[in-house]
Amino acid sequence: MQRFILRRFFYMLVTMLCASVLVFALSRLTGDPRLLYAQEGGYGITPEQWEALGKQLGLDKPYPVQYGNWLVRAFKGDLGRSMLDRKPVTEVVGERIFNTFQLALGAWLFATLVGVPLGVLSAVKRASIWDYFGRSFALLGQTLPVFWIGIMGILIFAVKLGWLPSGTKPDYISVKHFIMPCIALGWFSAAGYMRLTRSAMLDVLDSEYIKLARAKGVSGSLVVWKHAFRNAIIPPLTFSGLILAGFVTGAVVIETVFAWPGLGRMAYTSVTQNDFPVMAGVVLLFTGIFLIVNFLVDVSYAYIDPRIRYG
């Protein structure tokens, strides 16, 4: 296990370095960051100001030197200042990260509490109306795009019926403001949970030891939840960790549709406005979250399934 952990930490470090190189290269391909300053106010800047600004931002040095200086500061927690807000990137990200985590957690809870039980029910009641309902839910959930679900939810429940707010997030905790964004973001994953849980449960329910347990007179609920579900939960567990990380890193569309003040919407704005410090900070944060969650899921295998061992 120790060798596995050390190896994974090494891979995580290499991945973060590759992500930093990619982000830095793409930021330079999109244009000189000084152009953003030149466009402010609509009057531009003089050549002397252009050169002075380049020295201030370190843009007068070769690209490898620029990257090295930026990487050293990033490892120290200094990602620079936002070119739009004129605030430190850590402060700008800190203002939005809690909103994104709230949205991701709500979507994950919806997907888990709907998809997993529905998958178990569909497997236990195979070829019944519950099975057909579950498979239809999975089909619709994985074919309808999330932005369409969000837009239709706003049109029906906010505009037509007036039951729920159409978007934005107040400063206080409001359950009504979470309902539509969380359902829209978690719908696709709930369908994935359902299909994965159903498939895993069917494989386990058809195994010999389950048939033996039933032959010994073990109650149906005990067979399903103690014996079958425990062994069928590993594939959904893998999916769970990756999906939770995906909610955090991939909520750009939903945050844009519902005007949610989170990291996804901020990442989109930083890309369109060429705000490199914020864009780099968000991408590195997203990469780190995904790698850490994936690592924790892999480690949890050994504790859930004793058959799995890491060398």
Where are these regions (language model features)?
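An internal, D/E-rich "acidic patch" concept
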Residues: L59-V116
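Membrane-water interface segments at the C-terminal ends of transmembrane alpha-helices
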Residues: V21-T30, L57-G58, V72, S136-P165, ...
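Hydrophobic alpha-helical transmembrane segments of membrane transport/permease proteins
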Residues: T15-G68, L161-F178
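Alpha-helical transmembrane segments of integral membrane proteins
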Residues: Q2-R3, M16, I97-W130, V146, ...
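Hydrophobic aliphatic residues
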Residues: L26-T30, G41, A74-F75, M83, ...
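N-terminal signal-anchor/signal peptide hydrophobic helix marking the start
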Residues: L6-M12
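Residue-level recognition of pore/gate-forming positions within transmembrane alpha-helices
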Residues: M12, Y43-G44, L139, L155, ...
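Generic alpha-helical secondary structure signal
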Residues: E48, P62, Q66-W70, A74, ...
